[in-house]
Amino acid sequence: MLLAPANRTEFLINGNARPGIYRVIQLAQDQQFLESAEKVVCEIEIAGAPMDMGLPTALPRPNRYYPLIKPQDIERVRTLEFGGAFPGVANPWVGIDFLINNMQYQVEAVPTVVTLGDEEEWHLIVSGPHHGGTEGHPFHIHEVSFEVIKIGDAAQPPGTIMDTIWIPKDTEVVVRMRFIGWPGKTVFHCHILPHEDTGMMQNFLLVDPGGPVHH
């Protein structure tokens, strides 16, 4: 399991083994800014007589219904390019300006407006002459979740619902979203917080169908 910042997962550990101390290990990996050495996450002590406990045979049913989005129902396709510019102008102390669609975060700017009830497909890529191919970024969006359709050429299992996903270098990630909830302004951003805080974030506005656009 590769977890980007803000990813969550659940797993079971089967304790049906000899008594002793067992370690849960985080494996070494080198996914750009997620690079880390192998380390012990925790130690588990198994003791006493074995217990006869049945293990689940299937995943639990979701507690939230998220109907899948059909291609013919997609209202709009958007592309978000995560990149950077050297040397940093807005962030000279960092040395790089982090950008989405070649734009650094502006508090009052709302470059993306979506209509409540619409279903959209977003293509997420890492780009830029200096930035592309050197690192990935975890995309996180507020207020809604998305279905992951493809990571590169690999189609994902139907119903893979997330709100944060790692965009590997040189790879396009395709997601679909249904915009439900209430009107208002919110954000999406890179969840490596120093990247977010130095520009890799954008506002987007949810509006009622046929209603005025205020921001």
Please describe what each predicted stretch is.
Residues 84, 143-145:
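Short, small-residue-rich loop/turn micro-motifs
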Residues 1-5, 149-166:
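Solvent-exposed beta-strand/loop surfaces of large extracellular or lumenal domains
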Residues 7-11, 161-165, 171-177:
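Short strand-edge motifs at loop-to-beta-strand transitions and within beta-strands
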Residues 1-136, 178-185, 189-215:
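Extended terminal and domain-junction accessory segments
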Residues 138-140:
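Beta-strand signatures of extracellular beta-sandwich domains
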Residues 103-109, 158-161, 173-174:
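Active-site-adjacent structural elements in folded domains
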Residues 77, 142, 162-164:
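Low-complexity, intrinsically disordered short segments enriched for Gly/Pro and polybasic residues
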Residues 145-155, 210-214:
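Short aromatic-acidic-glycine turn motif
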